[in-house]
């Protein structure tokens, strides 16, 4: 797998950085990866969708080892569930519900531009250990589009301090 530089994601991450400057405990980012396996990844015998999800996590969080992870660390989600979870989590940091709804709607548009949501399988990474163990809340959604051979990862978390 390799990181994909997509214009809409780069611009969105710059906007997220401005939000993080206002609230340093909040971290939100989107990244896209191609699903072309490297030689090292081809040597592993892991189901393809799971292998792609784990590879994306490894690229984003190189300090953590995801080799022992299985399907038990992931949950399938619908787009409605993802949007509800994002709305709930972000509303804990920003009380204006209209702003939160607008923000989540903006994220949905960016995700749709990055990876066609209609053809996606959506997974949530559920393991509290590793990169998210010291967070008040977090979500890590992985959008896998087999046809586009792409994984888009949306991570957000609120640090404790």
UniProtKB/Swiss-Prot annotation:
Pfam families: Maf1. Gene3D superfamilies: Repressor of RNA polymerase III transcription Maf1. One of its GO terms (biological process) is negative regulation of transcription by RNA polymerase III. GO terms for cellular component: nucleus. GO terms for molecular function: RNA polymerase III core binding. PANTHER family: REPRESSOR OF RNA POLYMERASE III TRANSCRIPTION MAF1, REPRESSOR OF RNA POLYMERASE III TRANSCRIPTION MAF1 HOMOLOG. This is Uncharacterized protein ECU10_0060/ECU11_2080i. It comes from Encephalitozoon cuniculi (strain GB-M1) (Microsporidian parasite). The lineage of its organism: Eukaryota, Fungi, Fungi incertae sedis, Microsporidia, Unikaryonidae.
